[in-house]
């Protein structure tokens, strides 16, 4: 069963896909969205769902370090609710605290990637970390 991991921001959604057995996550792409205009990138998400035969979504929850929920948590949950309604597939949530920080550190320390290039892949890598954390927790 393939699972799609999503790192939801106000302008982009990082996408990761699990392998068919659900053991590993791979970063796939970054989808441009516009929350204010109600553009959530679902046309592209649908193409990916159909291509990979996705059966479940995992949406990252950007909780505060003290475990409280802020406005981005609410936005991520609203995005998850829209996914569930639009696709009719189950949506789980994964604590994503520090995933973007970890992703950026990996890109700097291990790949020595410039700031401009990091901006282009950071959300995809964060989605991969969110999904991998979810998969590790489940198995």
From Swiss-Prot:
Listed InterPro entries: RNaseH-like_sf, YqgF, YqgF/RNaseH-like_dom, YqgF/RNaseH-like_dom_sf
Gene3D superfamilies recorded: YqgF/RNase H-like domain
GO biological process: rRNA 5'-end processing
GO cellular component terms, semicolon-separated: cytosol
Group of enzyme by EC: hydrolase
Compartment(s) where it occurs, according to its Swiss-Prot or TrEMBL record: Cytoplasm
Molecular function, one GO term: nuclease activity
Chief localisation class: cytoplasm
SUPFAM superfamilies given in the database record: Ribonuclease H-like
Family indicated by similarity: Belongs to the YqgF nuclease family.
Name of the featured protein: Putative pre-16S rRNA nuclease
Organism: Streptococcus pneumoniae serotype 19F (strain G54)
The organism's taxonomic lineage, starting at the top: Bacteria, Bacillati, Bacillota, Bacilli, Lactobacillales
């Amino acid at each position: 069963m393939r699972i799609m991991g999503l790192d939801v921001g106000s302008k982009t959604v990082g996408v990761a896909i699990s392998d068919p057995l659900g053991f590993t996550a791979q970063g796939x792409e970054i989808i441009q969205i516009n929350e204010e205009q109600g553009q959530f990138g679902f046309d592209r998400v649908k193409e990916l769902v159909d291509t990979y035969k996705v059966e479940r979504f995992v949406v990252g929850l950007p909780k505060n370090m003290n475990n409280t929920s802020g406005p981005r948590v609410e936005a991520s949950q609203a995005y998850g609710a829209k996914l569930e309604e639009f696709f009719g597939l189950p949506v789980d949530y994964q604590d994503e605290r520090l995933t973007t920080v970890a992703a950026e550190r990996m890109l700097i320390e291990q790949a020595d990637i410039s700031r401009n290039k990091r901006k282009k892949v950071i959300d995809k890598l964060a989605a991969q970390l969110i999904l991998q954390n979810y998969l590790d927790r489940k198995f």
